[in-house]
Design a protein with these regions (language model features):
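Nucleotide-activated chemistry modules centered on ATP-dependent adenylation/adenylyltransferase
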Residues: 1-226
Length: 226
């Protein structure tokens, strides 16, 4: 992969952040980030991270950001149309660009769907972390200086009090044995505040935790003003 130019799908979480670090360490030039946000909410889809934090993250990476808005309760048809539009904008900005990376780790069905979608849009998808031992990867992330906080917890898989906790060694010790240490089965999502992929840390302030769809506990965060 050395020497390639690449776009990165950015979720605001640890896997995308670590994929960025891995690619940069491998000699890949990541030229920009692309992120989907839910229209009307101004938050990253799935993670629920505010747009203001997304912008702070992009600034910390010193990479340009392409924002793609999708409707609430988005189906595949609407998602694919919005994503295609975002990739078209990327190619207009970086003519000839044809590779996009995702931070997928384990789920083959999701990876297969994305590979097929990207191929239809004349892009090649790269998953630099796919197949990693997630126990080792989680510890490697923490040892490497990644700082993240759980911003969403699936309460059908984890107790609600895990929402808002730091993604640290203490969290890994407390996770039930059947829970993936990287939350790769949807057990939790994270918001990254610092790491080797950032030029500087971002400071966030924790807000309230709310339950959505009688299942998902979202902890709100805002940029902490100096």
């Amino acid at each position: 992969m050395r020497g390639r130019h690449m776009l990165l799908s950015w979720s605001g979480g640890k896997d995308a952040a670590w994929a960025l670090h891995h690619l940069q360490q491998s000699g890949v030039e990541v030229v920009g980030l692309i992120t989907t946000l839910t229209a009307g909410y101004g938050r990253i889809s799935m993670q629920g991270i505010r747009r203001s934090i997304l912008h702070a993250q992009a600034t910390a990476t010193r990479l340009p950001l392409i924002e793609v808005e999708i409707p609430p309760a988005c189906n595949n048809v609407a998602y694919e149309a919005a994503f295609a539009s975002g990739l078209q904008r990327a190619r207009q900005r970086w003519p000839g660009l044809g590779h996009i990376a995702f931070g997928d780790l384990l789920l083959q069905d999701i990876r297969d769907y994305r590979v097929e979608l990207c191929a239809r849009l004349s892009w090649e998808m790269i998953t630099p972390l796919f197949g990693s031992d997630t126990q080792q990867l989680a510890r490697h992330m923490q040892a490497g200086g990644l700082k993240a906080t759980l911003c969403c917890v699936d309460t059908q898989q984890l107790p609600v009090d895990f929402a808002g906790r730091e993604f640290d060694a203490s969290l890994l010790r407390d996770l039930p044995a059947h829970i993936d240490p990287c939350g790769e089965n949807g057990e939790f999502h994270t918001c990254v505040q610092d790491g080797p992929m950032f030029k500087h840390p971002i400071s966030i302030r924790r807000g309230e935790t709310v339950l959505r769809d009688s299942r998902f506990a979202y902890t709100d965060f805002e940029i902490e003003q100096p």
